[in-house]
Curated annotation (Swiss-Prot):
(6S)-5,6,7,8-tetrahydrofolate binds at S112, I113, L114, P115. This is Methionyl-tRNA formyltransferase. It holds the Pfam family Formyl_trans_N. It catalyses: L-methionyl-tRNA(fMet) + (6R)-10-formyltetrahydrofolate = N-formyl-L-methionyl-tRNA(fMet) + (6S)-5,6,7,8-tetrahydrofolate + H(+). The gene is fmt. Belongs to the Fmt family. It comes from Haemophilus influenzae (strain ATCC 51907 / DSM 11121 / KW20 / Rd).
Length: 318
């Protein structure tokens, strides 16, 4: 088993977990690429990415170009003479000159079973779409968006209660060992590159705050999935009014689907210790855990103790 000289490119904590796995292996990380430091916190002080922090703790040279399109940055990377480059949630586009620079090209860790979800938010979109299974794909990168040949796939189930947070944590457990398995066997033929069937792909579009607004003209089943998919960000929400006509926005963390009732979508059907039940175009959405402005998430019952007037039975929410 040959030890490889690796360039690692990544930015968030998810990427740092993969870097740590490589550092624990027989392979050598000769350089780390990560996004430039960004202002964070109340003081807006520049903060290093989790990947940069880990690299510096291990005395690994760190490169932080704003782009890899310039010839100078490409020449600098090529001069490292790496065997392979591993890319995990890096955040920069890799031009062909970079993809071709390492002897064995560039590998990417992708948070879904390709080609099902290509793009920025595969974990969230798999829950949003009601998928029952997902996983991690290790692929050889090409110039397309998540279109490269697949080397290794590891599967996991999506539970009916799964949030993006819990699924992210599952994949963060699976992915690093899958990556090491590929690196250990990259040159011995254990993993045969498999072409993707582009006709089976969907684009996992980034989430937006606008999309997180609960739309009662969608089915209760879809809205319940949205609530789980949009947790931890941007968190599903809706608005209601008090008796004086003041609007109040509420975030929703947990809900349950109940059988359909023939009422206009958005109608408040009941509001008690069992939840706040709202009619949708198909099914009833029972809101169980909510958060009002300036408060911590709480049960529907606790919210109703102080805010029952917000949820008059028969009122139709926008």
């Amino acid at each position: 088993m040959k030890s490889l000289n690796i360039i690692f490119a990544g930015t968030p904590d998810f990427a740092a977990q993969h870097l740590q796995a490589i550092l624990n292996s027989q392979h050598n990380v000769i350089a780390v690429y990560t996004q430039p430091d960004k202002p964070a916190g109340r003081g807006k002080k520049l903060q290093a990415s989790p990947v940069k922090q880990l690299a510096e703790q291990n005395n690994i040279p760190v490169y932080q170009p704003k782009s890899l399109r310039k010839e100078e940055a490409q020449s600098e990377l090529k001069a490292l003479n790496a065997d392979v480059m591993v890319v995990v949630a890096y955040g920069l586009i890799l031009p062909k000159a970079v993809l071709d620079a390492p002897r064995l090209g560039c590998l990417n860790v992708h948070g879904s079973i390709l080609p099902r979800w290509r793009g920025a938010a595969p974990i969230q979109r798999s829950i949003w779409a009601g998928d029952v299974q997902t996983g991690v794909t290790i692929m050889q990168m090409d110039e397309g968006l998540d279109t490269g040949d697949m080397l290794h796939k590891v599967y996991c189930d999506i539970l009916p209660t799964e949030t993006s947070t819990s699924l992210y944590n599952k994949l963060a457990e699976l992915a690093p060992s899958a990556l090491i398995d590929v690196l250990d066997n990259l040159e011995n033929g254990k993993f045969i590159a498999e072409k993707q069937d582009g006709s089976q792909s969907n684009y996992a579009e980034k989430l937006s705050k606008e999309e997180a607004q609960l739309n009662w003209s969608l089915s209760a089943m879809q809205l319940e999935r949205n609530i789980r998919a949009f947790n931890p960000w941007p968190i599903a929400y809706f608005s209601t009014e008090d008796k004086d006509g003041n609007a109040h926005t509420l975030k929703v963390y947990q809900a349950k689907v109940l059988p359909h009732q023939d009422k206009p979508a958005g109608t408040i059907l009941s509001a008690d210790k069992n939840g706040i039940q709202i009619a949708t175009v198909d099914g009833v959405l029972n809101l169980l855990q909510l958060q009002s402005a300036g408060k911590k998430p709480m049960s529907a019952q606790d919210l109703l103790n102080g805010r029952a007037e917000w949820f008059t039975i028969g009122k139709v929410l926008a």
